[in-house]
Amino acid sequence: MGGRVRVVVVGGGASGLVAAICAARAGADVTVLEGASRVGQKILKTGNGRCNLTNARVEPADYRNGAAIMPLLEEFSPTRVLGFFGELGLLVSEEEEGRIYPLSNAANTVLDVLRAGCKWHAVDVRCGQKVVEIARMQPDGYRIICANGNDFSADRVIIATGGGTDLLASLGHTIEPFSPVLCPLKTDTRPLKGLTGVRARARVSAFVDEDATEPRAVRYGEVLFRDYGLSGIVIFDMSREVGDGAVLSLDFLPQLSPGQCDGYFSAKYASLSASASELFGRAPNLTEFMCGCFHTRVNDAVVRAAGFKPSESVTPEMLPRIVAAAKGFRAQVTGLAETGQAQVTRGGASPWEFDSLTLESRLRPGVYATGETLDVDGRCGGFNLHWAWASGMAAGAAAAK
């Protein structure tokens, strides 16, 4: 192969733009073919418009099919990804739970530096070019054909778009059908009566069904109660782990063991019942007893989950059930909610059919796949964008060789 390596990147999203810059930096002649009128539009929607770039701690266990991409994740760590963006001039800040954002708190800043990176590395960006076919050329290379009749030739092709799975299927790759993940969950709403709009921090355990004794996954974070069920980042994470019939158990007192909870509520009962008897000549009711524990509406929901009414007078015999409800508030999952707003889709080409470091196809040498093209999805908190950047860096550098 004489002269510069010709690389065509199919898709001008997060992973595609990074792949293009890295390939161009390595000396390749790079063209990006984007079907939309502008590149990087999905980047602008990430992180509620703030763009959660990556996470300070990324492990293969954070991903579906993480074992298939372990070498890549080790090579292209958060430090290396942030180094790439630092070279493009982006400033960042780290927030709670390791989430890393641009210092500007604006996703358009990230897209701006990626566009600039393409410009300064002479990447030829062509929008309105929907690729419909990739054909092998003889003796080597590929012909990339667009819906509008345009065609391009390349020594290497990087498929960096979710729509590229059809292209990979035509090349013989195994495709897992797409389905939404990282979205709210519909649940049985009876236990959630009166909680719509309330936020509460909890340790959430997911069980595959009502009979399971060991959780499939455990997460801690803020839960948002909705009229259809549960939302919030911790619930988005759980949507990757559970299906219909699963049970979510919310522990509103994760910092206390069951024994410590028993002690807390017993001491509170002794103190409050003595005061109520002396002042009012009666026992406190459960609304009075739960005051100060959680949000008022969460207090009432816990009492009802324990099998009581908030207006009932509290007795010592009630306390174990109150503790059990506070540390094991249960809601059965009935499905996914707001799937049209899902942050990520699960599915794509099997990553096991690609090199675990370079992402070159094991079936079609010279073809690479990145980002959402592959059946890899991660937790909330910057993990999915990290995969986009890291996979783009890996494929771009490898394709230029």
Model-derived features: where do they sit?
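A glycine-rich dinucleotide-binding beta-alpha-beta segment and adjacent secondary-structure elements
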Residues: C127, D300-D377
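An anion/pyrophosphate-binding glycine-rich loop and adjacent beta-alpha core
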Residues: S37-V39, L53-P60, L91, T174-P177, ...
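Glycine-rich active-site loop/strand segments that organize a redox cofactor
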Residues: N48-E94
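A conserved FAD-binding loop/helix module that cradles the flavin
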Residues: R156, A160-D166, L171, D375-K401
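A conserved short coil-to-beta-strand element within the FAD-binding core of flavoproteins
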Residues: C127-G141
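N-terminal Rossmann-like FAD-binding beta1-loop-alpha1 element of flavoenzymes
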Residues: V5-V32, A395-A400
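Glycine-rich FAD pyrophosphate-binding loop
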Residues: A24-N48
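Short hydrophobic core segments
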Residues: V8-V10, L33, V131, I144, ...
